[in-house]
Each structure stands twice: as structure tokens, then as C-alpha cells.
Amino acid sequence: VSDLPSPAAGPIPAAFPLAADRPVPAPGVTVRPATVHDLPRVAEIAAPFVRDTCVTFEEEVWDVPAWHRKLDDVAARGLPFLVAEVEGPAEPGSPRGTVVAGYAYASAWRPKPAYRHTAEGTIYLDPAHAGRGVGTALLAALLEALAAAGVRQVVSVVADVPEAAGSLPLHRRFGFVEAGRLTAVGFKHGRWVDTILLQRSL
């Protein structure tokens, strides 16, 4: 994609260097590509957000085969699917003494082909490991991987609910800005929910 024109000047700031001038992930957090062995833990992290909150607009909890299909789809598009490990009880297939504390992946922003250089980022963390720098490590690695894949714009769609409040400052620390708001586009658990569109150039 090196011959692509630069994005037009506008409200989205130019990206700061991905390897410098960014939040530094906390020690003790390891980010790596997800494997099929991680999917039971990914499903475990995701389920309460689907079942109990409006953070995600999914209404059906995905089982492991559904997550396997998602992993395959992300890989087929050349996009990253990452997990973050921290010290904790050992899991099958994980190094001794580590536990997957969060995951992040990228999806196509829209199906039409001209959107191919824009991706949507998704990050979920186990609340039991909040405050350990897991989100910082995942978002840093996700942006690095997307830049390497030739993505030019990253969008994150954040539900405007208290449970997602931590997502806004995390993304803003990495240079995301609010690009818009969609009013009452989701209905879940008996209420209408707005979404906030965050965007960052790579």
C-alpha cells in the first residue's frame, strides 16, 4: 500500500510513531497472536459482557466453535487477533504460571472494497486483571500489527455506557479522537444505547 495517497487533512491527527511517544505497557504483560488453545479463555472473558452488559451489542454468547470461526476469518483477512497474558494460574496450552487476561482483534470496517485500508479494533479485558496495563499492552500491539498490515485508519466503536467508560481514556492515550456519535442505535436490556466513534490514523 506504499503507493496510496496520504489521507486528506482533517480532524484526525497524524499518527505519532508507534514505537515511541506512546503509553508504555506495564511489565509482566505478554502479548502474542491468539491460537485455538486460547479460545476457551477468550469465550470465558467475552461471555459476561454479552450476557450482562450493553458494552457489546451481541446478544448471544459465542461458544468456542464460533470463536474458532472468528479467528479463522480474522486470519483470512490478514488482520491480527491477539491475547495478553499475565502471571496467574496456568491454563492448558499456556506457559506455566500465566493466564490470558484479555484479547484484541481487528475486523473489516465495512464490506465494500474501498474500505479495505480501514479496520475496526476490538478489545476486551477480564475485569479481574484491571489496572495491570493489559489494555495498554493490547492496544499498543494491535496498532503495531495493523500498521504492519497496511491499515491506514483504525476505528473503535464504544458503547456510551458506564461499563465501557475505561475504553475512552485508553484509546485517547493512543491518539484516538472522537469522530462522531450515533444516537440510540442499539437496544439491549430494555434501553437504547448510543455509540461513540473513535478514530486514529496510522
Predicted stretch roles:
Residues 30-42:
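A short beta-loop-alpha structural element at the N-terminal edge
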Residues 15-17, 33-36, 59-128, 139-140, ...:
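Acetyl-CoA-dependent GNAT
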Residues 131-147, 165, 169-173:
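Conserved acetyl-CoA-binding loop-helix of GNAT-fold acetyltransferases
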Residues 146-159:
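Conserved GNAT acetyl-CoA-binding A-motif
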Residues 1-26:
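Short acidic N-proximal helix/loop "leader" segments that mark the beginning
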Residues 44-61, 73-74:
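Helix-loop element at the rim of GNAT/NAT acetyltransferase active sites that forms part
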Residues 105, 157-159, 172-193:
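Conserved catalytic-core motifs of GNAT/GCN5-like acyltransferases
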Residues 123-128, 132, 160-162:
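Active-site acidic-Proline motif in GNAT/NAT acetyltransferases
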